[in-house]
Every structure is written in C-alpha cells, then in structure tokens.
C-alpha cells in the first residue's frame, strides 16, 4: 500500500520531477533535489541535496536561479530573463584608452585576477564611489559583462571581499606592479599624505588623529607617491591614524626600490632619517623648510635675493619674475630662498585694499611685519640642478590632483567603513589602479584642447550610448553626431555592433 503524503494535493501536483522532495518549512514549501545514497551498513537512504526552488499552493513551482540554469543547460526549459540593454559608452571609452594598464596587470597577476581588478577599478572611475555590495549591479548592467562573459570571476560582495583580502595579504604581485611603475616613471616623485575618516570601530588602523576635532571620528592616514611629470600615482599605502607622516614615510620608502629619483615632499616629512633615505642610491630631494628651522632664522636676518633671477612660466600665458638667494650648507645640501616678486606685489595690493576697507586684523603693523615675506619660499635640496629647475620641480608638485580629491560626495573614498586590515591594504591597490585610469582619462580630455570640456562632460556624453541585444548581435543605440565627433577627437570610435 502506497504511503499517503502529508502535504496537500495543491502542493504535490506541482512537484517538478521524480527526483525532487518537498519540505514544509513553516508554511513555505521548499523543493530539494532528491538523491538515493547507500549507507555504510549497506542499506539505502535519501539525501535532500540542494535547494532548487519552492512551491506556492495553487500557483505552481518557482525554480531558483541555479535550477533555471541547470534546466537551460539541459535544453529542458529556457528562462530568458537576462539583461538586454547595457551601459556602453563610458566603459568602452576607458577600455580603449587604458589597454596598456590592462597589459601591465596581466603581467603581474593571473588573467582572471587581473581582469577582476581592472573591472572593479573601471567601475569606480566611471561611477565614483560604489559600495562593495553594489559593484555587481553596475557590472552586470555594463558593457564589461559582455567583454568578460567568458571569464569565471565574480563581482559580488563575497568575491570582491576575497579579492581585497588576497591583495592585502598576498602582496608579491602588488609589489611587482608598483615596482614596475616606479622603474618606468619620470624619476620625479612627489609623496603626499591624506587623512581619511574611518567609520569602522573594528578597523585595526583607525585611531584618533590630529584631525579628530574636525572629523568627529577616528582616521586612517594614506600616503601616496606620484610620478609628477606623468601625473600618475605609483603607490598607495594606509597607516595608523595616530602615526605621523615622517614616521610612515620611512616604511613607504623602505618597502620599494627607488634609484636616481628626485623626491618632492612637504615640510611634514622633515627628519634626519627621512632625508637620508631620500638621498641614498643616487636619489635627491626638495623639501620646504619651516619658519622654526635654525637655518631659516639665520638667513632671514640678512636675506638679500642677489644670487640671480629668472622668469617662471605659471601657465600658457602667465609668467612670474623670481629672484633668489642660494647657500651651500655642506657638500650635498643647499638652501635656496625664492621670492616671487609678482605674487608679493599682488598680496601687498590685496592686503592694502582690505586694510582700507577696515577689515578686522588687517593693520599697518601686521602689513609692515609680513609684507616682505609674502611669496617667499625656503627650499632645502640635495639636487644638483640649477635653482630655476629646482623651483619648477617644486611648484610642479602642487598641480597633482589625486583621485581621492576628485570624488566629491559625503559617502565616498574620504569616509570609509572598511574593517579588515588586509581588505584595507587591498583597497589601497584598487585605488592605485583607479587613480591611473582617472589620469589617463584626464590626459585624453586634455588632448582635445577644449577648456570648456571636462571629464564630467565626456563621461556624460559617452554615458548616453547603450548596447542593446538583437536577434543576431548587440547593436549601438542612443548616439548623437556631436558627441561622436567629440569622442573621436579623443581617439575613441564606438563599435556599431558586438557579437552575441
């Protein structure tokens, strides 16, 4: 006599196959793939196996995505619910202008991992800050999901968390990539520090720092090394929020090999140890001095900028007249004092106007005290270059825009919620790659030589273009002749079709 089922008939009639078993979980009828297993005793039993869907009484069987895929692969049933319209223009543009970056990643990482890193960075560069649990949505709805559909990597939360953890804990490929950037750079390297607010109480690096009163939260400190002439980042490294830059930079410099490099750093990095590190292996440095420096105090007493003068070009048409005083401290170290005459005159005029208007704290006494020192720079250097070159190198450092500074919103790269130590360092590398992509886009925009066109404008215009799925292929939609002409001037011509 057959055993009578305890499940209602309005449920059992929707049983999808013989090898399925239905389980009532508090009124939810889940369906599992049933299989027979032979026990060690020789007797037979059953195994529920994996979940394939659920049954709603009176409605039918609802397969989950795994079972849908299984049925489709067996040509038993098709569930055509895939995305048929993807964002094309922004991603295709960046893919075209960053081919060399993709090749560099492939030289240091396995192909799957290189592609995953590349896609993650592209998504961040195109869309600004995207939380890790939202990246996959952007990926699936982008042209990247077509380009890399034959790859097996995933872009979900777990997959990207594992990626960041591996980048932070298995650092040899990262070291190789960064060292290649350093070896092939212009040898003019700036190092700068950034304070990043950290909202995670479990982050090992997050600590109260010198900006606690401003941030109202712990911070982490990020040091970034840049190639000044090529305007790309070379290294990102996160340090404890309580650490000072002059100590953190010791670790940064020791972690990679720098040879015949000229360092441009700010006064916060001034220490004997750091200066020695920046002077070995044929390296040299340029660093501004603080007003409390003993040599600055001594030189100020009798300063006369009589060593020479030159004209510094500040822009396409703008220039500045610079006079300077130069003094050799020892066999290697010089102090050069520069005075920007035009800047000094401009600030004198501005101050006098504010003083005439009766603004608070703008007094004749303060004017007489400070007017001679406006536009004056005290630089210490071990570079053998002449004074005009040293000044030009130092001023060039100020034109660097980091990707951290480019993104402007409240929940962004300046307000991280990362908890894991390794994930934090893995994200450093993603930010490095994103910063390189950003600068390549910036250079491509500059080449069209239109001051009215910005990166934002280009991404908006390219972002209108879509790839839509048709019966025979994917086809380009939503284009405009004016936008196509602008993008062509950048060297990007969109594909009209893409294979299925």
Model-derived regions: residue spans:
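An anionic, glycine-rich sequence signature occurring as long contiguous blocks
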Residues: 218, 238, 282-399, 464-476, ...
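Acidic, metal-coordinating catalytic cores used for nucleic-acid/nucleotide bond scission
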Residues: 264-273, 291-294, 423
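Basic, amphipathic alpha-helical segments enriched in Lys/Arg and hydrophobic/aromatic residues
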Residues: 418-442
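Active-site beta-loop-alpha junctions of metal-dependent nucleic acid enzymes
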Residues: 237-258
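Active-site cores of enzymes that catalyze phosphoryl transfer or operate on phosphate-rich substrates
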Residues: 176-240, 341, 345-374, 378
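Dynamic "connector" segments at or just before major functional cores
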Residues: 1-190, 194-200, 224-237, 250, ...
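Short, conserved catalytic/metal-binding motifs centered on acidic residues
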Residues: 33, 135, 188-196, 231, ...
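Short, solvent-exposed helix-loop connector elements
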Residues: 387-393, 411-424
């Amino acid at each position: 006599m057959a055993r009578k089922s305890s499940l209602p008939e309005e449920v059992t009639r929707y049983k999808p196959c013989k090898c399925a078993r239905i389980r009532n979980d508090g009124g939810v009828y889940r369906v599992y793939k049933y299989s027979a297993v032979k026990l060690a005793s020789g007797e037979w039993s059953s195994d529920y196996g994996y979940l394939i869907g659920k049954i709603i009484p009176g409605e039918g069987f609802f397969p989950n995505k795994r079972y849908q895929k299984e049925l489709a692969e067996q040509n038993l049933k098709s569930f055509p619910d895939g995305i048929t319209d993807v964002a094309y223009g922004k991603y295709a543009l960046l893919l075209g202008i960053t081919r060399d970056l993709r090749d560099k990643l492939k030289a240091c990482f396995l192909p799957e991992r290189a592609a995953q890193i590349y896609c993650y960075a592209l998504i961040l560069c195109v869309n600004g800050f995207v939380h890790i649990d939202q990246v996959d949505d952007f990926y699936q709805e982008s042209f990247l999901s077509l380009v890399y559909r034959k790859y097996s990597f995933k872009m979900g939360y777990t997959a990207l968390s594992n990626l960041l953890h591996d980048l932070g804990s298995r650092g040899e490929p990262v070291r190789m990539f960064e060292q290649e950037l350093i070896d092939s750079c212009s040898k003019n390297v700036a190092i700068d520090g950034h304070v990043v607010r950290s909202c995670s109480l479990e982050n090992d690096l997050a600590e109260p720092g010198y900006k606690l009163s401003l941030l109202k939260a712990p911070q982490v400190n990020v040091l970034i090394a840049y190639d000044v002439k090529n305007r790309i980042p070379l290294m990102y490294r996160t340090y404890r929020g309580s650490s000072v830059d002059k100590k953190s930079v010791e670790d940064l410099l020791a972690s990679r090999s720098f040879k015949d490099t000229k360092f441009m750093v700010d006064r916060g990095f001034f220490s004997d140890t750091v200066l020695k590190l920046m002077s070995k292996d044929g390296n040299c440095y340029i660093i501004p001095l603080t007003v409390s420096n003993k040599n600055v105090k001594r030189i100020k007493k009798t300063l006369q900028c009589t060593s020479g003068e030159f004209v510094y070009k500040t822009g396409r048409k703008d220039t500045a007249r610079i006079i300077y005083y130069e003094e050799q401290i020892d066999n290697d170290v010089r102090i050069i004092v520069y005075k920007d005459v035009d800047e000094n005159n401009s600030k004198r005029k501005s101050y006098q106007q504010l003083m005439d208007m009766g603004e608070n704290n703008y007094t004749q006494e303060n004017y007489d005290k400070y007017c001679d020192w406006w536009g004056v720079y005290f630089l210490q250097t071990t570079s053998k270059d002449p004074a005009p070159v040293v000044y030009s190198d130092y001023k060039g450092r100020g034109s660097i825009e980091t990707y951290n500074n480019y993104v402007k919103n409240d929940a962004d790269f300046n307000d991280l919620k990362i908890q894991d130590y390794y994930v934090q360092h893995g994200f450093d590398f993603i930010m490095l790659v994103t910063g390189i992509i950003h600068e390549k886009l910036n250079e491509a925009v500059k080449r069209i030589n239109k001051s009215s066109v910005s990166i934002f404008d280009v991404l908006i215009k390219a972002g209108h273009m879509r790839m839509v799925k048709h019966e025979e292929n994917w086809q380009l939609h939503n284009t405009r002749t004016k936008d196509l002409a602008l993008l062509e001037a950048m060297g990007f011509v969109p594909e009209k079709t893409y294979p299925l």
